Structure formats: structure tokens, C-alpha cells
Regions:
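N-terminal binding-site loop/beta-alpha segment at the start of enzyme catalytic domains
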Residues: 1-80, 150
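N-terminal small/glycine-rich loop or linker at the start of catalytic domains
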Residues: 7-23, 83-99, 123, 128
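Short acidic capping loops at alpha-helix termini that bridge into adjacent secondary structure
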Residues: 14-15, 76-80, 122-126, 155-156, ...
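Short, acidic/polar
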Residues: 27-39, 104-119, 167-172
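Structural motif
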Residues: 38, 42, 118-119, 152, ...
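Active-site groove signature of glycoside hydrolases
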Residues: 116-136
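Beta/alpha (TIM)-barrel catalytic core signal, keyed to glycine-rich beta->alpha loops juxtaposed to Asp/Glu
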Residues: 132, 136-317, 330
Length: 330
């Protein structure tokens, strides 16, 4: 496994991040533990979760599965850089109470303590704001975070799904307040198919020294060779993926992508991950395997070094959004 520093911090993390959103809803506890064991054995030390994972009436279940894995003992917790998130309402669907969501000081304090209990640990290494909060000022958010850092309950703060201007606002507020270092990471939707983060999120993250952690690196499986798999009788796409495949232009791009990689004898999913590892500012993509076999495929991507010729060809199939935000600067 290869490692890098998380943004401007001294924290060393693996270039693949183990995503755990499937733990509970799609992968049972025993298989989830097996995946975490395999990831740790392979050198992945960066695990990502969220308080709402488990979803519906089972919100928090994913953190519980991870906590039970830590409780097995050994040096599991000491080896893992643990990241979780706060924002979503933790009440059962249809039973949401005020002050049990978003980023108020009250909810942050409550959410941290609840996550620590489920995770069976005394601290969270990276505590991420799962979404922007349009109602709570950053002065209040940072006041709550500063207390938690002083208490040793969290070490670093990060963002998720933030626009560039909110990254700037958050860190300028932290700098004005003094003391804390502000956001150190941004977790965003970013992959070959969806490159809008290059317009202003990633430039802002780089300017403020945030490590970029892409989620959905295969764009819901579309970059994993979906057309070939469907032709061979594989699982049919659903939801947004099905909507994308119904678009003739999108389908043509995916076909060109699969044809290109077939010509090079490469696996689409591995190339999609390897491409992200070449991108400026990227710490590592989140991979969310449902099985140990899917994890093995992701691990191969770390050793794959796409040629300049291949990277240029990928840009032709999936062009970036352009020179924004400095399109007219000189």
C-alpha cells in the first residue's frame, strides 16, 4: 500500500479509503468484519463512515459494526485512521426531532458522544461535516469543534459535499478565531464521468491545504465496465445509473471508455481508481466493497500507473469542465 499525508496535516493515510456505507444494509456483520480485516492486512489504514449509515430505522448500525470489530481487540483501533460524519437527522424516518440534525453546537456535541459509543472508541480522528448547514454560523460550529478537540474526542475536522466558497468561509472563520487549523479534508463526488469538482471545489481545497477524498469513484458502478457486464447477463442498473444509461450520449461515452480499455487489456474499474490517484490534490478515493473480491480489485489499482497516452485518451472520452474558476484571468 502507498501512503500520503492528509492535506496539510502530518497524518499519514493510505491512498485507498475503505468506505463502509454497505456495512449493515447490504453486507452483514461477519462479512463486514472480514472486509475490514482484509483491508487492514493490505495496508489500508483510512476507514470512512457516517452516523447515519445503516439508514432508515437502522441509522447508526454501520458505526456499531465497526465498533464491534474494534472490540475484538488486537491493535485494530491503533492502526486505523477513523473518519465519521455528522449532519443527518438520526431520528427514525418520519420521526425527526428538532436539534437532532445539522451542525448546531447542541447536535454536534450529542452526535459525537453517540458516535463514540457506537464505535466503542474514545476518539474520532477525522470528524466530517456531511453537508453544508445554511442555518448555523461557522463561529458556532468551530466553537463546538474547539471544545471537542480540547476534550480529546476528535483530532481533525473535515467537510463533505461543500462548495468551494464554503470551504473558504469555513477556514477563513477558523483563521479569524485563532487556535484551530480549520478543515483539513473535503469529501466530494469526483470521478472520470463527473468532473465538476475541478471547477472550484478542488481549487479551493488545494488553496486551503485540504486533502480531497472522492466518493463514488466508479460513479455508481458505471465506470466498472457496466455495459460489458450487462451484455454478459450481469445485474441491471437501477436508479440514477439506469437514468444515465438511458441517455444515448452518456451511453456512447461509456462504450468508448470500455472499448479503449479493452484495447489496452485493462479493467475499467481499476483504471477509474488509478486515474483519480493521478489527480492533483487527491488523497485517495473511497472504495466501498460489498465483498472481499471487490476489495482485491481496488487494491490492484494502487499499483497501476496509467501512461500519459492513456490519460490523454481518457480526457478525450471524458473531458474536464474547463479552466474555471480562472477562465478569464491572466
Amino acid at each position: 500500500m502507498k501512503y500520503t499525508q492528509l492535506g496539510r496535516t502530518g497524518l499519514k493515510v493510505s491512498r485507498l479509503v475503505l468506505g463502509t456505507m454497505n456495512f449493515g444494509p447490504q453486507t452483514d456483520e461477519a462479512d463486514s468484519h472480514a472486509i475490514m480485516d482484509a483491508a487492514l492486512d493490505a495496508g489500508i489504514n483510512f476507514f470512512d463512515t457516517a452516523n447515519v449509515y445503516g439508514w432508515g430505522e437502522n441509522k447508526g448500525r454501520t458505526e456499531e459494526i465497526i465498533g464491534n470489530w474494534f472490540a475484538k481487540g488486537g491493535d485494530r483501533r491503533d492502526k486505523v485512521v477513523l473518519a465519521t460524519k455528522v449532519y443527518g437527522n438520526m431520528g427514525a424516518d418520519g420521526e425527526a426531532w428538532p436539534n437532532h440534525d445539522k451542525l448546531s453546537a447542541l447536535n454536534i456535541r450529542r452526535a459525537v458522544d453517540a458516535s463514540l459509543k457506537r464505535l466503542q472508541t474514545d476518539h474520532i480522528d477525522l470528524y466530517q461535516f456531511h453537508h453544508i448547514d445554511r442555518d448555523t454560523p461557522f463561529d458556532e460550529i468551530w466553537q463546538a469543534i474547539d471544545v471537542l478537540v480540547q476534550q480529546g474526542k476528535i483530532l481533525y475536522a473535515g467537510s463533505s459535499n461543500f462548495p468551494g466558497y464554503k470551504i473558504a468561509q469555513a477556514n477563513e472563520t477558523a483563521a479569524r478565531r485563532g487556535g484551530g487549523i480549520g478543515l483539513v479534508s473535503e469529501q466530494c463526488l469526483y470521478n472520470l464521468f463527473e468532473r465538476r469538482a475541478e471547477m472550484e471545489v478542488i481549487p479551493a481545497a488545494q488553496d486551503y491545504g485540504l486533502g480531497v477524498i472522492p466518493w463514488s469513484p466508479l460513479h455508481g458502478g458505471l465506470l466498472g465496465g457496466v455495459l460489458k457486464k450487462q451484455a454478459e447477463g450481469g445485474r441491471r442498473a437501477s436508479g440514477r445509473a439506469a437514468d444515465t444509461l438511458a441517455d444515448p450520449a452518456a451511453r456512447a461515452r461509456l462504450q468508448a471508455y470500455e472499448d479503449l480499455l479493452d484495447k489496452h487489456g485493462l479493467e475499467p474499474g481499476e483504471v477509474a481508481l488509478a486515474w483519480l490517484l493521478t489527480r492533483p490534490g487527491v488523497t485517495g478515493p473511497i472504495v466501498g466493497p460489498r465483498t472481499a473480491g471487490q476489495l482485491e480489485s481496488a487494491l490492484r489499482a494502487v499499483e497501476l500507473e496509467p501512461s500519459g497516452e492513456l490519460l490523454d485518451a481518457l480526457d478525450e472520452v471524458f473531458p474536464g469542465p474547463g479552466p474555471s474558476p480562472e477562465a478569464f484571468a491572466w
